[in-house]
Amino acid sequence: MARMSFLSFLLFCLTSVAHGNKANKHKPWIETEYQGIVMENDNTVLLNPPLFALDKDAPLHYAGEICGFRVHNGPGGSGSAQFEAVVLDRSTGEGLVRSKEPLDCESQKEHSFTIQAYDCGEGPDGTNSKKSHKATVHVRVNDVNEFSPVFVERRYEASVPEGRLFDRIVRVEAVDADCSPQYSQICFYDIITPNVPFTIDNDGNIKNTEPLDSKRQRVHSFWVTAFDCGKNRAQADAQVIVTVKPSCKPGWIGWTKRIEYTPGSGSIPLFPNLHLETCEETVWNIQATVELQTSHIGKGCDRDSYSDRSVRRLCGAVRGEVDLLPPPSPATNWTAALPTLPSSDSSLVFSFNGSTHVAVVPDSVASAVSGDHFTLQLWMRRGGASTQPPANQARGTRKEEETIVCSTVKNDDSYSHYSLSVHGCRLSLFYWPDVSAARPVKFLWKLEQVCDSEWHHLSLSVQFPSVTLYVDGVTFDPALIHDNGAIPNPAPHQRLVIGACWEPEEKPKDIVNNTMPENKDTGKFVSGYKGLLSGVTVRPGNVEPHSVVECLYACREGLDFGDLETLGSGMKVHVNPSQSVLVLEGDDIESFNRAVQQVTYRNSLRFATPGVRPLKLTTSLRCFSEESCLSLRQLEGYLVVLQPDAPQISLSGVGPHLARPAAEFEGPQGVPLFPELRIVCSLSHAVNTAAQGMEGGALMSDAVAHTLDGCEVQPLGEELNTEREELLVDMESLRERGLDIINTTAYIAITGAESISVYEDVLRSIHYRLAKGSARFERRFRLSCSEMNGRYTSNELTLEVNFLHSLDSLYHPSHLLASQQQFLHPSHHTGELSGHTLPNPHRNSVVPGAATVIIMVCVGFLVVMVILGVFRIRSIHRRGEGARGGGKEGGNQWDDSALTIIVNPMETYENRMGITTDMEGECEDEEEVVDSPDDTSDDQRIIIKKEGRDSAPRRY
């Protein structure tokens, strides 16, 4: 019974499971929205996300499988007609959407419809099938570049006047039927006809690349094509016809872009053939601006290449200036910490950063420039070496006050204070005659030169209460301000600072003792200067006259006007102080054209700085009818200053040998080294000074052509030994001429701009002196000179000095034995004749007979003659010079060779014995024998000093 119950229960469970497999409990699930893309030439839609239907009844057969998708119409009502969805895998539910027919992007770019998934139900017949929710599908049809561009017109025509450049002559247009921006847009046009003076841009605008000439070609015909962004070319090209109409050519005629200037030419016209054509347009005002750019030449323009001190001498400036920023040295170490920059004119340029770069001048130097009458001069450039002028030339944007020089000096029993500062585009001098009593006075100038980031020279002449400012040699008047505000008194301590101002620390007063604390120099630097400074000098005493200041620092090149008397009525000419901008203004065309042809460029330097100076001409016209008034473009060119002819400085009239007895060199004045020196400059000095265009121009041009600025005398080989030799120079004569000298054992350098004749006199006065007893046999010197701050150098003149020693000077009687049995011992002179070979000291102690002595003397004389001849032949081959002089007995006189003969003291021995002979003629027939130096029978010894070949490096 129990067994039957168990079988019944098992049968019931199997029946229940069978009924459970056929149940379809869940409906499929898909995404709510799909984005699709389909190409025009394809029917498969790429969906994002991919089409997958999921069913929770999986993995049941039928109920967990996806049997299909249904497409329903969207808002447009065309979804089911154009698209279908198929199942790719029933178990995973993957599906695919595709179009039933080819799609056309140009007809419809986007399609929207809904899609629904359904499962397989409970059996193969799909009983009890369930459907998912409806998902929206958006399909975008991607374009294919199937269409080519088509021009709107097949032919385009335009007419333009000749002689002008146009921004647009005619515009061509092409369209593309593709639907997408990528293929429907025209990316570029192209002129396919070669060698036509036209160009076309991407928008189809055609313009000419050069002025058209109707006489050369009246009609221009060419073809253009178009390309879409898919690089499809137009189906048919378009023809463009441009007709050139004869017309007037308004503008400047005769413009030359390149102008050459030869140094030394004076003034040359820049536009000798230039004239303005207005084509009968009524013009009531014409203004032309000529700009010459020289800011890249030196410090703002072409100036003298000499040192500041030399230029001051040439211009006749008063001496006595004190250099506040000298080159760093052990004696002038207050500038050692300042960074320096290279300069084209070899001057020293110091950089200041507004904080740490400050120069404190020692009190010993500051006390030398005290007083209320002084001249302060300096080169200044705001902002540093890398700063460029602002493009918009905005002024006054910098509000920080920057102090250039700040000085408190003691005058007798009081202290005076002044400071030179820049504030934006303003330059101010703050002067306090007496810091303990008087109130300060402020002199103010508003200058564009202060804030244009260019090099400018400032010269401030103070004769309190009168102050005069020169900027690049041009005078500027100040605005006087009596400042009675609450300004603290400067500390009564002498201090001169460059690049900032010293602000002492305030100390509280001791109320109990009613005293001030102990005076300690504590404080800080304030109002630091940011920029470059060079040549900062102060000269106490009377100020320089205007002509000297202009000669010192005015530009030597610039624009000028030829003849103001020929200027027509109604014409105006204005030239800026630096002569880099010239403005012409008038109302008459003919007068204006004549005036333009009078604009000149001048450069008063004989050795002008070569290079390019950009040139611009800007024209502004005003007409009665502003709408039709002509507009002229800016003309640009350049002026080329050619390389000047290098002067050939020739030194002659010296040597190459100078032979004198050693006794003359040992005299108190020594011997002049260059008594017949001649200095010649081969360059022609004809300078056109008729139209220099400025005061002092002719003077400088003439002075430059005949001026040297340095010569150097250098001993070759070893340096001078001050204990045995020296070069003597007339220091008083140098001071009178204002020349400087550097006198060392390695060289003597004389510097300063002076005429050739002055340098000849100075060099001729140089003497060479030996100390008594100096056994020197030769010394070589080299002389060279330079011009234009070392820019041009002379030839190197080498002089060999030979010292002729007598027998007594070489062999003092004390060196000989009283006995006639021994000759000179060489050890007595080895110290003096270092480097020379002396004979073997061993001698025969037996006194020879008279005949033997005579024979030995004759033979020795012949040996001397033979050896001299051999060495003369070697000297001829070595130097390439012919020997001068004869060779007869004791009357022989040799040329200045580096050869010294020392005769054996046998001759002295004979004189002391009273022996004479007349047998010299017989000795001439004797055999000529040259024995070895070691032979004990030698009676004559020859000591030879060869010419030295070492030389020191050249400083010129």
Swiss-Prot record:
Keywords assigned? Calcium, Cell adhesion, Cell membrane, Endoplasmic reticulum, Glycoprotein, Golgi apparatus, Membrane, Postsynaptic cell membrane, Repeat, Signal, Synapse, Transmembrane, Transmembrane helix
Mostly located where? Answer: membrane
Where is carbohydrate linked to this protein?
N333, N353, N513, N743
GO CC, sorted alphabetically, is: cell surface; endoplasmic reticulum membrane; Golgi membrane; postsynaptic membrane
Chain ranges sitting on the Extracellular side read 21-850
Instruction: Give membrane topology per the record.
Output: Single-pass type I membrane protein
List the biased-composition ranges (Basic and acidic residues).
Answer: 938-956
**UniProt GO molecular function:** calcium ion binding; cell-cell adhesion mediator activity; neurexin family protein binding
Q: Which GO terms describe its biological process?
A: excitatory synapse assembly; homophilic cell adhesion via plasma membrane adhesion molecules; inhibitory synapse assembly; negative regulation of excitatory synapse assembly; positive regulation of inhibitory synapse assembly; positive regulation of synapse assembly; positive regulation of synaptic transmission; regulation of excitatory synapse assembly
Residue ranges spanning the membrane: these are: 851-871
Domain (Cadherin) spans 30-151, 152-271
Domain notes from UniProt = The cytoplasmic domain binds synaptic Ca(2+).
Purpose: Synaptic adhesion molecule. Promotes synapse development by acting as a cell adhesion molecule at the postsynaptic membrane, which associates with presynaptic neurexins.
For this entry, the protein name equals Calsyntenin-3
Protein source organism: Danio rerio
Q: What is the lineage of its organism?
A: Eukaryota, Metazoa, Chordata, Craniata, Vertebrata
